[in-house]
Amino acid sequence: MGKEKTHINIVVIGHVDSGKSTTTGHLIYKCGGIDKRTIEKFEKEAAEMGKGSFKYAWVLDKLKAERERGITIDISLWKFETTKYYITIIDAPGHRDFIKNMITGTSQADCAVLIVAAGVGEFEAGISKNGQTREHALLAYTLGVKQLIVGVNKMDSTEPAYSEKRYDEIVKEVSAYIKKIGYNPATVPFVPISGWHGDNMLEPSPNMPWFKGWKVERKEGNASGVSLLEALDTILPPTRPTDKPLRLPLQDVYKIGGIGTVPVGRVETGILRPGMVVTFAPVNITTEVKSVEMHHEALSEALPGDNVGFNVKNVSVKDIRRGNVCGDSKADPPQEAAQFTSQVIILNHPGQISAGYSPVIDCHTAHIACKFAELKEKIDRRSGKKLEDNPKSLKSGDAAIVEMVPGKPMCVESFSQYPPLGRFAVRDMRQTVAVGVIKNVEKKSGGAGKVTKSAQKAQKAGK
């Protein structure tokens, strides 16, 4: 076996008809966790339904349908392997809650793969003012996905097929607009592919002898290659934020007979260890962690990315809840936010948003109404430059700096310090109307909170 490969998360973005499903389906199909039997079954069904020409997307559609019906599919189906990495596709748009998932998502994507269609008229539709391509790329960048790969898809349907001229034209245009967003095109591999026929997906295509390969230049080291698979191998693996103080947003709290109160959640930053004295915010309760476990096995430490349950002493299941944040009481313990300043981008709101607007904010696992108390300035969404002070209102497409006040006690952090606790989705009318990143947080100076007996003991012993 040797050493396990590093795990990488990618998000696949692009216009609705760019061929995202076919492309991802192809990778999963050829390098992935779908066993031969399932593939044969899918192929047979696809053929019977006259969808033979659609088999890769069909595989993905089947998986998506199962996912949407709430059947949790074997997640290995969304994984595939490259020579260096295990890659998980954490989400692909087209999914109703894609934007919300991308923000509150259980995991941050390490890289975005942008698929653009090269077919006649298709590229133009995707990149036009109201195309989704720009929106998705902007979102990815705003939410901290700083690595990008571009697949120029459907090269088989250009005029003439596999046209170098068309490819060059698209690369030029996409480079210009990802640059406006903030990506540096020199660090972005561009690959001409056909997700359907398989050109340049896993190996060099004989249909594009003119394509000499892609190159990236960056301080971490230059790279080059030909296929999309090779481009995925150039992704720089994430550094786990173990050196930051602990932040663990609670997903649930269970009461387990014979054990007691067991909060469950994912370590976002720092390390959780048994014996540690932790503080829960915004409730301001401090107690000792007795044990930590993952998949029913006791751990001596839990690291960022680990979903764990941990047993806490002298705390009732009524005291803490989903959306609370657990941290180390000795290292920058989490606190309730009195208010926070955010950079917000309005995505799709039918009317005008003015001061006083109070939608629900989804930030990490918290789901709380917050008031847009003050619209401080309207800014250019790409450069961040100020356009006007104290705008009267905001509409779709606008970006602004906004002062926000939670309607109920809530714990959030600045994006620069704790990224997963500093990005949020604004939900209204059953959709994501805006996204935001938190610039700074004014903490509520809490009085003395509740410190349990076991915490006092542990603190004394630790002195």
Swiss-Prot record:
UniProt keyword list: Acetylation, Elongation factor, Endoplasmic reticulum, GTP-binding, Hydrolase, Magnesium, Membrane, Metal-binding, Methylation, Nucleotide-binding, Phosphoprotein, Protein biosynthesis
Modified residues (N6,N6-dimethyllysine): K36, K55, K165
Residues covered by the tr-type G domain: 5-242
Compartment(s) where it occurs, according to its Swiss-Prot or TrEMBL record: Endoplasmic reticulum membrane
Annotated EC: 3.6.5.-
Region (G1) residue spans: 14-21
GO cellular component, one term: synapse
G2 as annotated region, ranges: 70-74
Modified residues (N6-methyllysine): K36, K165
Modified residues (N6,N6,N6-trimethyllysine): K36, K55, K79, K165
UniProt-recorded name of the protein: Elongation factor 1-alpha 2
